[in-house]
């Protein structure tokens, strides 16, 4: 019996994994045949150090298993050990992009991932992780392999937090870029006022220049002849003359 028959969920679909170092710096490069050409191969930032540390822990697990059994790690144990790392990468990739890199879709629904308990895996026992934490027989195990598993899980949790933070930052950046476009498409209050007041000015009664000059001249002449005379409101007089303007039909 081969590994495909033992764990068909690991080989049921072709998955595409991306370089974790490049993801730390906002790039998406396929992991296959990428190691030697990776731009961040020797990067020593805190995020890339987490990636390297997790790889060291995986190597440490293999060394412990090989030294105890005095034989290479079994295929089953290797698959269970590597599955957690692959599942974490699937989770981090799906958190970073909307494209599903670690899960296939069937009828528009994402395929459910079913991770195994890594503590049990180190003791050659297969148990599904969901609802298993409190009932795990190796919950309080302090063997070297379980201690490495605990440290690796902490690193993986930190990396998932990093991917989620990167996703939030990317979404915020996209929102800031879309905001000016939406604002430019929204009519401003000034334009609205101009649009609403323009018809009013066009429909208002046009002022007759001849009648206005006559009213002003009449008022000036009357003030010269009798300065003590009390005049009514000039605007009322002007509006009365304009309303009876004989030049409207000209």
Curated annotation (Swiss-Prot):
UniProt feature, compositional bias: Low complexity: 186-201
Major subcellular site = nucleus
Q: What induces it?
A: Negatively regulated by lin-41 which causes degradation of the mRNA encoding this protein.
Annotated Gene Ontology cellular component terms = neuronal cell body; nucleus; perikaryon
**Xref: Gene3D superfamilies:** DM DNA-binding domain (4.10.1040.10)
Query: What is the consequence of disrupting this locus?
Result: RNAi-mediated knockdown results in male tail morphology defects.
Q: Which residues bind DNA?
A: 19-68, 117-164
List where Polar residues composition bias occurs: 90-100
- Cite the SUPFAM superfamilies for this sequence: Cysteine-rich DNA binding domain, (DM domain)
Short name of one Pfam family: DM
Could you say which tissues express the protein in this record? In males, expressed in the tail tip. Specifically, expressed in 15 male-specific muscles of the tail tip called the diagonal muscles, and also in core body muscles of both males and hermaphrodites. In males, expressed in ray A-neurons. In males, expressed in PHC sensory neurons. In males, it is also expressed in the hindgut, B lineage and somatic gonad. In hermaphrodites, expressed in the anchor cell only.
Coiled coil regions in record: none
InterPro entries given for it? DM_DNA-bd, DM_DNA-bd_sf, DMRT
Protein name in UniProt = Doublesex- and mab-3-related transcription factor dmd-3
